[in-house]
Amino acid sequence: MTYAWLWTLLAFVLTWMVFHLIKMKKAATGDLEAEAEARRDGATDVIIVGAGVAGASLAYALAKDGRRVHVIERDLKEPQRFMGELMQAGGRFMLAQLGLEDCLEDIDAQEAKSLAIYKDGKHATLPFPDDKSFPHEPVGRLLRNGRLVQRLRQKAASLSNVQLEEGTVKSLIEEEGVVKGVTYKNSAGEEITAFAPLTVVCDGCYSNLRRSLVDNTEEVLSYMVGYVTKNSRLEDPHSLHLIFSKPLVCVIYQITSDEVRCVAEVPADSIPSISNGEMSTFLKKSMAPQIPETGNLREIFLKGIEEGLPEIKSTATKSMSSRLCDKRGVIVLGDAFNMRHPIIASGMMVALSDICILRNLLKPLPNLSNTKKVSDLVKSFYIIRKPMSATVNTLASIFSQVLVATTDEAREGMRQGCFNYLARGDFKTRGLMTILGGMNPHPLTLVLHLVAITLTSMGHLLSPFPSPRRFWHSLRILAWALQMLGAHLVDEGFKEMLIPTNAAAYRRNYIATTTV
């Protein structure tokens, strides 16, 4: 019997040793393959496709960690776009974490201290509140997006291990399901191949590489039409002015010390023509009368139209859920990865949050050539980002739907209830404003606010006296709210939306920290 126990123990030890040796051999083989890849890739650790806010910020962050970065951008001239003109307080904090907050200086950016809302002759101003658990000033920045992008590019290019090049990426280079680099045309028209162990695709909402990496489709929700009124200043230049106009919203805000951006949202299926003057007529006759005369909002809105509208622009508002890219050697970021309605102006904040997370995950790796290790880290990145991204995606989607004017009594009741909830100015409003500003990204807290807005809307519809018709419409409000919320619970994940530990971990690791 004693010998049997000894033989059993010996067999167990030998089996463990064999498995351990096999595991060590596999690890050694993986390291050797990684070293071989590193030798092949030569002077570049990361190729970044696109040098917008996301691409330029990521290039700087990775280069500061010692990575050799090659950035390929289609057009290095200053972008002339009117999206991405509000950096929320949470986004400013992320820039500070990356060492990039000085890029908001010297671009004539304006402080964004509050949201002003207007509906049917009533208005309220909702300041971004002080939050003791948010280690930064609760103030955003209103700005010219192109100026910010140029500052970020300059900051990235100032590092010796960043190569910023103008060129158009044509395709990704793949070998056995692993992305090894890109093929691109440089500014001289030469076709070049570039290799790196990691390629990051962040070439924006019109990405031509995304469809080869993820099975995802974008949805066009509406169009934003915008122009700049020059030599003007709002009486309240530190608020984002949101007008509950019909059929969709208008937004007015100060982007420089003497320029005001005016934006009107129009339905995707009925956008007036800009070239033949229909748009000017639409803005002047349909939208301008809905702009409140409070302050000088309507005056500035009309001034821009009457001065000839030299640079009226339109852009599609899009929505696209984030999807895991299962190919190794590549990551998708920014608007190429995840989009939401711009009503809460938080796209840049989500992208910068993603960059902070990704930088921290990659930082411990001595090199990026072990694609399995990088792939495993990227899978965890998709989970860690959820508190910020799910909160913003859900809030943007539901707000954009609720603020659509309609003759439907239930939906109009929800729209009025939303205004009433925001206009209260109590602790509930302050809590929602910390979420809007990115100071408290917490999906469960957002869900509770949405429930409260729904109940407020139902109460508004039932007062002063309930009737069978009003009761029926209040039930329709509840059903619609559950439908909207349920869609996001499915899309973002029940666990990620409803379990508070994920949000607590995100806040502990990425907000309650000191600037690096």
Curated annotation (Swiss-Prot):
Its EC number is 1.14.14.17. GO terms for cellular component: endoplasmic reticulum; membrane. It comes from the Eukaryota. FAD binds at V53, A54, E73, R74, R81, R153, V169, D335, M348. InterPro entries: FAD-dep_OxRdtase, FAD/NAD-bd_sf, Squalene_epoxidase, Squalene_monox. It is a multi-pass membrane protein. Its cofactor is FAD. One of its GO terms (molecular function) is squalene monooxygenase activity. Expressed mainly in seedlings and inflorescences. Keywords: FAD, Flavoprotein, Membrane, Oxidoreductase, Transmembrane, Transmembrane helix. Pathway: Terpene metabolism; lanosterol biosynthesis; lanosterol from farnesyl diphosphate: step 2/3. GO terms for biological process: sterol biosynthetic process. It catalyses: squalene + reduced [NADPH--hemoprotein reductase] + O2 = (S)-2,3-epoxysqualene + oxidized [NADPH--hemoprotein reductase] + H2O + H(+). The chain crosses the membrane at residues 2-22, 43-63, 435-455. SEQ4 or SEQ5 are unable to complement seq1 mutants. Catalyzes the stereospecific oxidation of squalene to (S)-2,3-epoxysqualene, and is considered to be a rate-limiting enzyme in steroid biosynthesis. This is Squalene epoxidase 4. It comes from Arabidopsis thaliana (Mouse-ear cress).
